[in-house]
Amino acid sequence: MRECITREAALAALRKYNQEPFHLQHALTVEGVMRWYARELGYGQEADFWATVGLLHDIDFEQWPEQHCQKAPELLREAGCGDDLIHAVCSHGYGICCDVEPTHLMEKVLFAADELTGLVGAAARMRPSKSVMDMEVSSLKKKYKDKKFAAGCSREVI
């Protein structure tokens, strides 16, 4: 099992560099998605690690968007994170803002989940309920095909 900082320490590190509600909510969403995928894909023993990677994946984005995934290693080391977690976090920027290639299944899940949660979240905010709980998959597929909808979410990455 991989070493991981506590969730409390991860949240403190995240909040040190992120204050915007959107960024904090995105981090919490990706954390939950990563935990779910860890269990779903047979990595339940590593669910906390996967979730922490999801929580911290954009630690540097709010304050240093032009250095995204490049400033992260410094911030994560300062928070007590190990090399496995740092590599995983940086790998979600592969081909976009860094050259750290996702090699582990968890890193590939993060690569896609980051963009996908943005698309799903944008679709949910358009609904009267502001929730995914009553969203039909067909509605999401329709929005996915519209390149103008959530244009910042890379369909190629998804």
Positions of the model-derived regions?
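Short helix/strand-capping connector loops at secondary-structure junctions
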Residues: 151-158
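Residue-level signal for pocket-adjacent positions within structured domains
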Residues: 9, 144, 153
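Acidic/His-rich, divalent-metal-binding segments that scaffold phosphate/diphosphate chemistry
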Residues: 1-64
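Divalent metal-dependent catalytic cores for phosphoryl transfer on phosphate-bearing substrates
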Residues: 43-150
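Residue-level signal for secondary-structure boundary elements
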Residues: 22-25, 121, 152
